[in-house]
Each structure stands twice: as C-alpha cells, then as structure tokens.
Design a protein with these regions (language model features):
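Acidic side chains
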Residues: 69-71, 148-150, 161
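Short, surface-exposed, low-complexity cationic segments
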Residues: 159-167
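A short, sequence-level motif marking secondary-structure junctions
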Residues: 112, 123, 162-163
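Glycine- and acidic/polar-rich repeat regions and solenoidal domains
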Residues: 1-120
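Active-site and glycan-interaction determinants of carbohydrate-active enzymes
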Residues: 117-158
Length: 167
C-alpha cells in the first residue's frame, strides 16, 4: 500500500445501464438521482474545493465528481440531474426470471421507443481517470479497455443500446 485516502462519495461511473424502479417506500430512490448535488467533472470539483483550501473540513463536504450518461430509467427510476443523454419513463418492463429444463432465463419487455441508442462505446479514453489513483481504466496488460461485447458475447455497435444485451 503506497498510501490511503478518504473517499467521501462519488468518483463513480455509470454508462449505458438500465435502471428499473418499483413500488417506492418513503425515502427510497432508484436510479442515479441519489447523485444529485454531486459535481460532474474534475474541473467542477477543483473549482468548488479551491475556495476551501484553508479549511479541510469544508473540502470534505464537496462531493467528488460522478460520471453518468446514456442510461435508461424505467418504472419510476430517476436519473442524475446533470446526465445529458437519458430516457426516463414510467414504462414497466415486467422483468421476470423463469426456469425451463434446469436453465434460467431473464425476460424483459423493452418499450417500443427503445432505450438510449446513441450512446458511446465504453473505452479507456472515455472513462475519466479516478481522482485518487489517477490510473486509467485498462486491461491487465496495459492495453485499452474496450467494452465491445454484450452479456452473450455479441458485438456491441459503436453506439450501443443501454443495458447488457445488444440488439
């Protein structure tokens, strides 16, 4: 261990996901709306913390940046207020898990209008570098990380749909 640091929340990344709500309880939230109030870039974080450099207690109150984009929110799930490309809908995808002949199947009804489809493929160059480690997201051998396959190994387009399944 070369050092330690306190992480006060944030420094998270959510790209190309599907969030599904449900029956809300008081105080319950689903989706990325829990990040409302967080900064959304390292530049914004530095700008907000620079005014408190003489008071570490106030610096710790500034939320670290989160990087959230190209997600779909269904059945009451809500997105981050600064997310630029998202779909929010009350559509219920009726998610089910069924079992046939010893195998399990995920069933989901996709809305006719689809899910976010003009997203970027997740790659090393579009995953912002973490604040504390300052190390890029890459493969163990140091080459570029490219998420170009879906859950089943099918090729993901240069503009993939939200969620684990392409097409």
């Amino acid at each position: 261990v070369k050092g330690t640091a306190v992480v006060y929340g944030g420094d998270d990344r959510y790209f190309n996901n599907i969030f599904v709500g449900g029956e809300p309880d008081e105080g319950w939230k689903c989706g990325t709306e829990l990040y409302n109030g967080f900064t959304s870039s390292m530049e914004e974080y530095i700008e907000k913390t620079s005014v408190y450099l003489s008071d570490p207690d106030k610096v710790s109150g500034v939320r670290q940046p989160v990087y959230i984009n190209n997600n779909s929110y269904l059945a009451g799930a809500k997105g981050f207020e600064k997310e630029k490309n998202k779909i929010e809908s009350d559509y219920d995808p009726k998610i089910r898990v069924s079992k046939e002949n010893g195998s399990f199947y995920l069933e989901i009804d996709i809305p006719e209008y689809g899910l976010v489809t003009d997203a970027q493929q997740v790659r090393t160059h579009n995953l912002p570098i973490p604040r504390i480690t300052e190390a890029p997201y890459e493969k163990p051998d140091g080459t570029e990380l490219v998420i170009d396959r879906d859950y089943f190994g099918n090729c993901r387009a240069g503009t993939p749909t939200a969620g684990p399944f392409e097409g």
